[in-house]
C-alpha cells in the first residue's frame, strides 16, 4: 500500500529508542544497511537511549533508485513510551515517508495500549473487500516502533526461547495485524571496530492480518504465506532489553535484509561500549 519505502520503513522501525538527555540511561547508536538480493539499496540511522522506565526513538532511513525495485525515498520515524515490568507502553508514534511525489504521514497518541488520537495521510481507500477497522482494533496494541522492543528478566540474552515466545499486536494507523514470533536458535555473530560482536537470539516471524487489509491483494496473500521472516535480537548493554540486530524478509525479488553494521552502546558519563555487549 505504501510502496517500497513503506516496506523498508516498516522494517527499520524494529530498531528502537531514546529518553531525555537529563535522564541517566544507555544510549544506543546504530547504522543499518538495507539490501535486496545482496545489493545495497539504502541505510538507516538510529539514535536511541533507554532508562529503566522510558524509551524514545529517532530513526532516519533512505533508499536509492539503484534498480527498478527502489526509487529515491526517505523515511523519518519517532516514538516514545514507558517500560513497566516486562511491558512496553508507547505514548506517541510519528511516521513521515516520501517516495517521489507520494507522501505518507502518521501521528498517533496512545495510553495504556489504546490509541487516543490518530491522524493518517492518506486515508484508507474504500474497497468492498477491505476488512473494516473497528474501535477494538485500536485497543491493547503497540505501534511499529515499540513492536519489537523485547524486555527480558535480566541484562543480556537471557532465555532466548522465552524472548521469542510472543504474539505482538500492532496498529500502524492503517492496519491492525499480529506478528507471531517463535524461537529458532541462539547464535554468535562476529563484528569488528564498532559493530556488534556477541550472541543473538533468532526468532522466526509470521504476519497475520486482522483488519484494514485486503485479502484480494497479491502482496497481502504473499506476506500471509511468507515463511521466510526472521528477526535477530541483540542485547542492549546493561539493560533488560533486546533490539533487532538483523531483519530478514523474503520477497519475490530476493531477500530483503536489514543488518546493523554499527552498534555502539554508551552508559551516561561512560565511554562507548563496542563489540560484545552482553
Q: At which residue positions do the language-model features occur?
A:
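Extracytoplasmic beta-rich ectodomain segments of secreted or membrane-anchored proteins
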Residues: 135-174
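Acidic, serine/threonine-rich low-complexity disordered tracts
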Residues: 22-112, 158-278
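Internal, conserved structured core segments that host functional sites
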Residues: 101-145
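A general, composition-driven signal for non-globular sequence regions
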Residues: 15, 23, 120, 130-134, ...
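Bacterial N-terminal signal peptides
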Residues: 4-17
Amino acid at each position: 500500500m505504501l510502496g517500497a519505502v513503506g516496506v523498508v520503513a516498516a522494517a527499520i522501525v524494529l530498531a528502537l529508542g531514546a529518553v531525555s538527555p537529563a535522564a541517566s540511561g544507555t544510549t544506543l547508536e546504530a547504522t543499518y544497511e538495507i539490501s535486496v538480493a545482496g545489493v545495497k539499496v539504502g541505510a538507516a540511522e538510529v539514535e536511541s537511549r533507554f532508562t529503566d522506565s522510558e524509551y524514545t526513538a529517532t530513526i532516519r532511513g533512505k533508499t536509492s533508485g539503484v534498480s527498478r525495485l527502489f526509487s529515491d525515498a526517505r523515511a523519518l520515524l519517532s516514538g516514545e513510551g514507558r517500560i513497566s515490568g516486562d511491558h512496553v507502553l508507547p505514548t506517541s508514534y510519528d511516521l513521515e515517508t516520501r517516495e517521489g511525489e507520494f507522501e505518507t504521514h502518521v501521528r498517533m497518541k496512545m495510553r495504556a495500549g489504546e490509541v487516543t488520537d490518530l491522524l493518517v495521510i492518506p486515508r484508507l481507500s474504500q474497497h468492498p473487500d477491505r476488512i473494516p477497522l473497528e474501535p477494538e482494533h485500536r485497543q491493547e496494541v503497540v505501534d511499529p516502533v515499540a513492536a519489537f522492543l523485547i524486555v527480558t528478566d535480566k541484562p543480556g540474552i537471557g532465555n532466548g526461547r522465552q524472548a521469542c515466545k510472543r504474539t505482538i499486536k500492532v496498529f500502524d494507523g492503517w492496519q491492525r495485524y499480529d506478528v507471531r514470533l517463535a524461537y529458532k536458535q541462539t547464535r554468535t555473530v562476529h563484528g569488528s571496530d564498532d559493530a556488534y560482536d556477541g550472541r543473538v537470539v533468532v526468532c522466526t516471524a509470521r504476519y497475520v492480518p486482522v483488519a484494514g487489509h485486503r485479502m484480494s491483494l497479491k502482496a497481502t496473500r504473499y506476506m500471509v504465506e511468507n515463511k521466510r521472516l526472521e528477526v535477530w535480537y541483540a542485547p542492549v548493554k546493561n539493560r533488560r532489553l533486546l533490539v533487532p540486530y538483523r531483519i530478514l524478509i523474503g520477497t519475490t525479488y530476493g531477500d530483503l535484509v536489514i543488518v546493523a553494521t554499527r552498534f555502539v552502546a554508551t552508559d551516561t558519563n561512560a565511554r562507548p561500549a563496542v563489540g560484545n555487549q552482553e
